[in-house]
A protein has these predicted regions:
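Substrate-binding/active-site groove segments that recognize
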Residues: 276-300, 307-318, 361-367, 390
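Periplasmic-binding protein-like
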Residues: 93-95, 162-201, 230, 369-372, ...
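A ligand-binding cleft/hinge motif common to bilobed small-molecule-binding domains
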Residues: 150-165, 347-348, 352-357
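Catalytic and substrate-binding regions of cell-wall glycan-acting enzymes that process beta-1,4-linked
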Residues: 335-401
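Export/targeting segments at the very N-terminus of extracytoplasmic proteins
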Residues: 54, 224-273, 306, 323
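Extended ligand-binding regions for polar small-molecule ligands
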Residues: 58-74, 109-121, 181-222, 243, ...
């Protein structure tokens, strides 16, 4: 039975020194099957792309595998080799507040973002498949239907099925519990000694990635609506105020190609759905438009709820177009951040990320920049809460409607 991967360093502690790469690769070359040679050569290439520890561990396992199959059967290819050959990482996932959220075209989540990051690190496409429960998802790994799983299954369940797990907190459970996330969230692999699992362990437990994981957890904070006051206040607004404006939200969401509940979440974050709201900075109405933005959107009366909702919807659509090069699902977070602090502020962050050699179209990178510079820029703090809160309100409404 495979043992769970708990910590990267602990996992390698018991390994003995394997044969040299040249010896291991010479075993591959001796096969007479041409098609199998090609597969094994691709495995060898994949080995060379791994960190030194992962490479030696992988070779150690291959050199000592007496039952290694030199036919074209499924056992002839490691999970890592299959992923690289397909250029796609297929993941079985169970919906949850710590794994992924997928309703009405919105697909995001703490585990989802980390899994997407791992796929990007491999240079492949992520193919996420939704399963009803942990056992079904783990069975998909067990029977080779998927490459790995994203669940909050217990270690006992994973061990009993002969699988290996990698905790996404990399042993730092307090990081997740602080933000209301389940510390059991993990990746599960069929074989802990496979290069796919070893590469994942190296990726998620890298010192820089551990810090990034904490920032992603901060964005997916689940504590907002677990607070009784916040939950009751939000529910009351949906019950008592929303019916007065629901048709306007729906009409203008259709007009400008939005999800209407996203507009409601924005309206609640902006004004608690108060049509007469006025802030000390001069923004007004349900969607809290500035005077200049209102004029640009054709709004003559900012406290008129219909005009305000239409103006907010129109402005959000313009912002989505402004960040058209940002792929979904990140584009909506970019647009919301721009709605809060202006598109030029977001583009300035993108420019800085480019200078740092980072992906400027990644929301995780933008959010990390906001978090890293929050102490020196109060607008960044406000923006972080703004986008994260809207995400929470949106998820709550979607879950209620399911």
């Amino acid at each position: 039975m495979a043992k769970p991967i708990t910590r990267f360093t602990r996992y390698f502690a018991h390994l003995t020194r394997p044969p040299t790469p040249s010896l291991a690769m010479s075993r591959f070359i001796k096969t007479k099957n041409i098609k199998t040679k090609k597969i094994l050569q691709m495995v060898a290439i994949a080995m060379l792309s791994l960190p030194a520890k992962s490479l030696t561990t992988f070779e150690h396992g291959m050199a000592n595998n007496a039952t290694f199959n030199t036919t074209l059967g499924s056992d002839a290819k490691t999970a890592h080799a299959k992923v690289m050959m397909r250029q796609a990482l297929t993941v079985a996932a169970v919906h949850g507040d710590s794994t992924f959220f997928s309703i009405d075209g919105f697909e995001h989540g703490f585990g989802y973002d980390l899994t997407r990051g791992y796929a990007n690190d491999l240079g492949v496409t992520l193919n996420l498949l939704s399963y009803d429960d942990e056992q079904d998802a783990l069975n998909a790994v067990r029977f080779g239907d998927v490459d790995m799983a994203l669940t909050v299954a217990s270690s006992r369940m994973i061990n009993d099925m002969g699988l290996s797990e990698l905790n996404l907190s990399c042993g730092r459970d307090a990081t997740l519990t602080r933000y209301g996330l389940n510390p059991k969230v993990s990746w599960t692999f069929k074989e802990g000694s496979d290069a796919l699992a070893l590469h994942a362990s190296h990726y998620i437990c890298d010192d820089v990635q551990v810090l990034d994981t904490a920032k992603i957890a901060h964005f997916y904070n689940q504590n907002l609506l677990k607070d009784d006051y916040n939950q009751q206040h939000f529910a009351k607004a949906l019950t008592e105020k929303l019916p007065n404006y629901k048709s306007s939200f729906q009409t203008h969401a259709d007009e400008y190609n939005h999800d209407w509940e996203l507009l409601v979440a924005m309206g609640y974050q902006e004004s608690h759905l108060n049509a007469n709201a006025i802030s000390p900075t001069g923004v007004e109405g349900i969607m809290m438009l500035t005077n200049s933005t209102a004029k640009q959107m054709g709004v003559s009366n900012r406290v008129d709820p219909v005009q305000s909702i239409r103006g907010g919807a129109k402005y959000l659509e313009l912002l989505k177009a402004e960040f058209a090069d940002v792929p979904a699902p990140d584009r909506i977070w970019f647009a919301l951040a721009a709605y809060n602090m202006g598109p030029y502020a977001v583009k300035d962050i993108q420019a800085k990320l480019i200078q740092e050699g980072k992906d400027a179209n990644s929301w995780s990178n933008v959010y990390a920049h906001l978090a890293d510079n929050a102490q020196s820029n109060g607008r960044y703090v406000q923006c972080m809460h703004y986008v994260s809160n809207i995400r929470s309100y949106l998820e709550e409404m979607k879950l209620q409607s399911v």
